[in-house]
Amino acid sequence: MHLPESLHDLADNETVRFLRRPKSISRIFGGVFSLVIFSSLLTDGYQNRTESPQLRCVLNSNHMACSFAVGAGFLSFLSCLVFLAIDAYERRLVGTRFKIAFQLLDFILAVLWAGVWFVAFCFLASQWQHSKSKHFLLGNSSAKAAIALSFFSVPVWILQAYLAFQDLRDEAPVPYKRSLEEGSVVLNTLSPSSTSPSNPPITGPNSLSYTSSALSPYMTTPKAPRLAMMPDS
């Protein structure tokens, strides 16, 4: 099946190729999950009971549970947006140290967010288990959606941590390694040689002997003539 030329151009577009990267896909999923979590609990997470007009959290009437989920979802959503924007300009970064620092920060935050969402899932599921759904007419579906997406956010952030670790490992640990190797090549080229025409060996009775471009450990010195005593005849 032959695709139109416009679709080929769309597939080769830089923006489309950027969005098809595994890291970009994981960030988009993490951001969408976080958006649904905090928006659903922020709108339908606080309801009033049938016998009271006071608003309460649908998760066992625990205000801390709803506040924790809303705050974590909002901060996680902002984190995904910020890192997605930095990824778009990652190729324009020329500083190697800045790239390594950014990838290290990405890895640390991904591990932290994976732990946060695991704790959030356990906490929200425990509060939902102890809550009575008959007390609230609305908000049950929002609570279930927040619990489910909290669970699915854990593998998403683990994937982001793995991808960040891969990028961090691919970077050269010593940025000046290549310059050191080039410097050693230059030094080896400029080292004196015993067969170099610019340093020919010196021959003569009072000359010093050179072996392999290094001075001999023992230097020979001419001995002074000795006076011999002749017997009287």
Curated annotation (Swiss-Prot):
One GO cellular component this record assigns the protein to is:
membrane
Q: What is this protein called?
A: Synaptogyrin-4
Keyword Transferase attributed: no
S-S bridge residues:
none
The record, for PROSITE patterns, names: MARVEL
Pfam families, alphabetized: MARVEL
Q: Where in the cell is it found?
A: Membrane
Q: Where is the composition biased (Polar residues)?
A: 204-219
| Disordered: annotated span | 191-233
Domain (MARVEL) spans 18-169
- Gene giving rise to this polypeptide: Syngr4
Q: Which UniProt keywords apply?
A: Membrane, Transmembrane, Transmembrane helix
Question: Where does the protein principally reside?
Answer: membrane
